Amino acid sequence: MTIKHLRTYSAIIFLISMVSCIDTYDIDFNQKNSVLVVQGFLTDDYTNPDTIKIQYSNFNDGNTFVSPISSVKASIVSTKSGKEVSLVEQKTGGFLPPRDFRIDASEKYSLRFTLPDGQQFESSPEQIYTTPPILNVYNKFILNSKLSDDGKKFISANEVYLDFKDTPKQKDYYLWRYTHYEKIVHCSTCYASQYDPKTLGCTIRLPNFNRTPYYDYQCAGECYAIIKNNKINVMSDVVSDGEVIAGRLIAKIPYHFMYGCLVEIQQMSISPQSYAFHRNLELQTQSTGGLADTPAAAIVGNINNLTNPASKVVGFFGVASIQKKRYWVDRKGVNGIYDYILGHTPFEEPPSMDTSRPPMTSCVKSEIRTPFKPQGWQ
């Protein structure tokens, strides 16, 4: 075995041992139906910081319900200087750092919070690592790319790839996230009912509804869906130190519409501990919706219960540098299998003698929708 192969073998063994050291514990969901989950990054994306979420995941009859916790006192602690900065609680749930907060590359940071019942928690310290830039982004249209959410058919998708150059002579760990934006035509769906502009809801009941189980209503103006990726995508440079990483698969964007769509890719350098946690999470939850959903065994990260050390907390608080790139996916000239963004074939309320119907509905700004054209839209 050559020295190069020996080093590679040793590094692989180190990674395997590191992942296997991540603590997991079985949850009897029939007995314990509520789990404290913490997730989020402190990043150098100061214009669009990560929301740090502290919430309960409740499991009932196989379903998952996420419950934000109000009146939590949360802060970021600089472990070297001891400086503590309070996080700002959001109305929609979660916490953000103050607008003037900046990461010091020489510091390490911990998340500290107290629940309303007085229990105190603190994460192990994390530091920022420099992230190399994204060099190229490109895509391929694949006719039968992925299974539909219900697992009943294959759907077409644009598979998005990127290239970047790994930093040489150091151990690096990467995590990728993406958000994609789709233009949508319909803003409301009413089941066995019609939309009422007076109540802004599906309040006109149709007891003899014998067409389809629903009506879809067009948006009154432009509207864009915001679709965040929920799949974990991590990598170690153990066998590619200093090399150009070409063709890393980042996303499979379903063929929702004949028009193009916009994808924002985030490339992050993360700590070895964060990599081990997310790699373990990747292995356990790729068939589910993410950390808040039910894993085979809950994954304990770096959050410690100071009040009751025996109590386990699921999740991880990390610190990361982000490199971003927005990429336009052009669907011109492709013909594939539609995956309707509504989850069903659109069916609009038919015209009637009442010329005020069917009404159009508003595009209400939220975490999953915006009436404002995203930057980079073509």
Regions found by a protein language model. Give the residues of each.
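A sequence/structural signal for flexible, mid-protein segments enriched
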Residues: 22-73, 77-378
